[in-house]
Amino acid sequence: MAAAPFLKHWRTTFERVEKFVSPIYFTDCNLRGRLFGDSCPVTLSSFLTPERLPYEKAVQQNFSPAQVGDSFGPTWWTCWFRVELVIPEVWVGKEVHLCWESDGESLVWRDGEPVQGLTKEGEKTSYVLSERLHAADPRSLTLYVEVACNGLLGAGKGSMIAAPDPEKMFQLSQAKLAVFHRDVHNLLVDLELLLGVAKGLGEDNQRSFQALYTANQMVNICDPAQPETYPAAEALASKFFGQRGGESQHTIHATGHCHIDTAWLWPFKETVRKCARSWSTAVKLMERNTEFTFACSQAQQLEWVKNQYPGLYAQLQEFACRGQFVPVGGTWVEMDGNLPSGEAMVRQFLQGQNFFLQEFGKMCSEFWLPDTFGYSAQLPQIMQGCGIKRFLTQKLSWNLVNSFPHHTFFWEGLDGSQVLVHFPPGDSYGMQGSVEEVLKTVTNNRDKGRTNHSGFLFGFGDGGGGPTQTMLDRLKRLGNTDGQPRVQLSSPGQLFTALERDSGQLCTWVGELFLELHNGTYTTHAQLKKGNRECEQILHDVELLSSLALARSAQFLYPAVQLQRLWRLLLLNQFHDVVTGSCIQLVAEDAMNYYEDIRSHGNTLLSAAAAALCAGEPGPKGLRHYQHTALEAHRSVGTTQGLVGLTRLALVTVPSIGYAPAPTPTSLQPLLPQQPVFVMQETDGSVTLDNGIIRVRLDPTGCLTSLVLVASGREAIAEGALGNQFVLFDDVPLYWDAWDVMDYHLETRKPVRGQAGTLAVGAEGGLRGSAWFLLQISPNSRLSQEVVLDVGCPYVRFHTEVHWHETHKFLKVEFPARVRSPQATYEIQFGHLQEADPQQHSWDWARYEVWAHRWIDLSECDFGLALLNNCKYGTSVRGNVLSLSLLRAPKAPDVTADMGRHEFTYALMPHKGSFQEAGVIQAAYNLNFPLLALPAPGPAPDTTWSAFSVSSPAVVLETIKQAEKSHQHRTLVLRLYEAHGSHVDCWLHTSLPVQEATLCDLLEQRDPTGHLSLQDNRLKLTFSPFQVRSLLLVLQPPAN
């Protein structure tokens, strides 16, 4: 052994070892340069296609000679390479690799099956042809390499999140056969880890110096040109790593993981190939490392692979049986945690868990959502209702203002449901097994002393890639060595089981898990948000009418297969980079096409159900109006009269979950006792609308100067202020353009001033009064709006059309209220949250832009003002000002985001008493669910009919559908929730022929103790605050 000098300098010793393993410096004489030995060329041919062809079709194409250095492209095309190789006889007994480096993402095909992904960005640049070449092995072989013209994270022009460069070209830089020296690889791993220990523990730690001196001795012993020196060097490393830690060492549970965004900086179709590249690589690793477990979420991606790569899918199922491939999450996709409705969140689990049960024999026990932009306070209840009590995520480590205080804790939801939550303390779902990451997992843990276990997700992610053999080798060496936490390769189930054993001292977080970042995603790509809201409602209506038709018609077949397809499209669009608008233009276009598919087929199914529902009943031909919520509706609706299709208004009353005939010219109801709408335009150009419930005054530019609750004379608009005030903000974030709106945007507020004289009267009163105006927002953008007040309606509507052509601007509308309150209320899934004024401490201040669904409310003791909407999500309440976020104009990753024409409606509702007493929730449902007017193909009923009603206004009947596993196809599922935040006993009335009623969970599994007795066509139900309850109703066969 070479003698070490008496004194050693820490830095020079450290850097000496660094250079010995460097892939950049001194590779002509260092160890890294010996990783590969002898090599030989391969014969290449290729063909280029704009399509993503299946293997069977691709290999039939005409291939032309190709060589290293060739360029191909452009972006989103595919280049297929035929690789013909001959392995030299002298390589028998050696490990042989195909070395491949190219721009883009590659997939190796062997014998017609995908076998491994190759991507420079994912540190996968060689494919193992043989771990030890045998004399009997074939020497000649033909492989195919499918190269996608996009990188692991898309093809952004100039930066990762920039819009894709459509002209980008790609190049093949290496293709050869080479002998791989596994002993060199092992030494490189040892030395890298020793350097990591030395650096991570620092110069004041004895074990740090021990690691550094061990590495130095290895360099002294190891001559890269003489492999016979390697074993002695490796023995020094083994001795170091063989020194065990104490019993109190923290245990890290390392799980292989490959986060693949279902669409983001690449289109949906490319994700299918990303799955094949990533998961075929994981299969090879599972074959070579029997202790390695790989967690995989998102049923949609598995279904894609099942359909397009059946051989690979069969391997995944086999490794699932062995316990190495572990399905997690339980959802169809890793959805956004804010914007989807409560019912849509339930369907994520319903579709996902049923898929995992059918395909892998069991449901998931962990909810897995590592990357999303916030977490609704109703998720714990939804998880528990779907058989899940464990939750893993890490996105809150991105918080901009406040550091979240826990990594392992209980999360208590809106109704009191609790789940065990773990954030891997390394603050990443894409670890690589370095010492730095392992140490951070311990030092960064905010629950030290409460639990001695942590998760560690390793593998390249976001764009796929997944784990590598090098990552596994690192983690194995760190299994139990002094100075480091214990590392064991575990499954998510093993991690949570260990955490549950230590859960007695864990803290509890109550309410929403709010991400203090990415709050621009509540508004970006407004058309995607609108499509989401509309399609959620269309599917609600199709299920409702189909269920009622099923109950009343023996001939009607519930469209279960069609509805599953449409629901899965909607759930796909609710992926956390799609509905949020943080995706490229190609993805947004695909999503809009999916919405159109849902609309088109949904409306066809609606018409079929309506026709079946009333078939055979006596009455005149014409229209029927359907009420699709459990509330009686009194609405002014348009009725088409005459051959020319002229529209006139009529007042219609439709019962809860039922229908009524449309009025004819001879059956129009008198207005009394309701007061007709009064409209007056003053000489100064202002307009007053009054329906006896509220009185609205607009100034000549269309701003709201007064909103009075007539019965009390109470003014809702702050003195001297203007409501319906459009405001424009500069909107330039720090980096994440489509994602972020920063706090400083509030400092750039600019009111958009209209011109006096643009306000004109529209509808002149009676059943409806309105006024409209035009507003030039900027030289490039304009707005038109009709302000509408209907007879008997407690709110005024603002029908808005915007032509928007801006760059980094943010449009909002504001309503200063004559209300003083320290907190506002925001609707969320199956309930609401109350949040403090964001001008208080940092946890509130970070909520300067928040999300809500259909309404927000600001109330004091006996009066309040609610702001409703039909397709918006971003909002805020600062002081007494209610604000609705309308449109943004980011330029990355989609330069076209939000550009063009938009239509939307919001409404303002002053009210006496609390929002619960005033019926704000019902009003928001009415705004979002206008009466369905469907033609009667034959005789239509001339009487009203109601299928269900609920005795308490606090309980909302949200969903009526056929049960997923209805053996006789005669079982309905009803989902109800308590919306006021109160304990409620109520009656559910039904006119349907119910034979049996039972409580069930959200997966529609019967509660064995949940039998409900039917009394006079009524069921008694009990709710705690914000509780969601589901019922199974078995129907008697209809008479016809």
Swiss-Prot record:
One of its GO terms (biological process) is oligosaccharide catabolic process. It is found in: Cytoplasm. Its cofactor is Co(2+). GO terms for molecular function: alpha-mannosidase activity; carbohydrate binding; metal ion binding. It catalyses: Hydrolysis of terminal, non-reducing alpha-D-mannose residues in alpha-D-mannosides. SMART domains: Alpha-mann_mid. The keyword Ubl conjugation does not apply. Its main location: cytoplasm. The active site is at D371 (nucleophile). Keywords: Cobalt, Cytoplasm, Glycosidase, Hydrolase, Metal-binding. InterPro entries: Ams1-like_N, Gal_mutarotase_sf_dom, GH38_C, Glyco_hydro/deAcase_b/a-brl, Glyco_hydro_38_C, Glyco_hydro_38_cen, Glyco_hydro_38_cen_sf, Glyco_hydro_38_N. Belongs to the glycosyl hydrolase 38 family. This is Alpha-mannosidase 2C1. It comes from Rattus norvegicus.
